[in-house]
């Protein structure tokens, strides 16, 4: 590597919106704020929400399932 062409690589403090703080190294050289971290992200905390895609599909089928079908033939007199 060439000398004196690379940015400074220093330890910075990262602060999450939940209040968790940790240190990492970066060339940003100033404190960093983030929205989620491993302490508050739903994937890591186990508080994931599952989407009800089956209910949405069923609701669509209820509304538009008969669309395009021919009406039942009535018996001729």
From Swiss-Prot:
Part of the 50S ribosomal subunit. Binds 1 zinc ion per subunit. Keywords: Metal-binding, Ribonucleoprotein, Ribosomal protein, RNA-binding, rRNA-binding, Zinc. Belongs to the bacterial ribosomal protein bL31 family. Type A subfamily. The gene is rpmE. Zn(2+) binds at residues 16, 18, 37, 40. The keyword Ribonucleoprotein applies. Coiled coil: none annotated. It comes from Pseudomonas fluorescens (strain SBW25). InterPro entries: Ribosomal_bL28/bL31-like_sf, Ribosomal_bL31, Ribosomal_bL31_A, Ribosomal_bL31_sf. Transmembrane segments: none annotated. It comes from the Bacteria. It holds the Pfam family Ribosomal_L31. Its cofactor is Zn(2+). This is Large ribosomal subunit protein bL31. Binds the 23S rRNA. One of its GO terms (cellular component) is ribonucleoprotein complex. The keyword tRNA processing does not apply. GO terms for biological process: translation. GO terms for molecular function: metal ion binding; rRNA binding; structural constituent of ribosome.
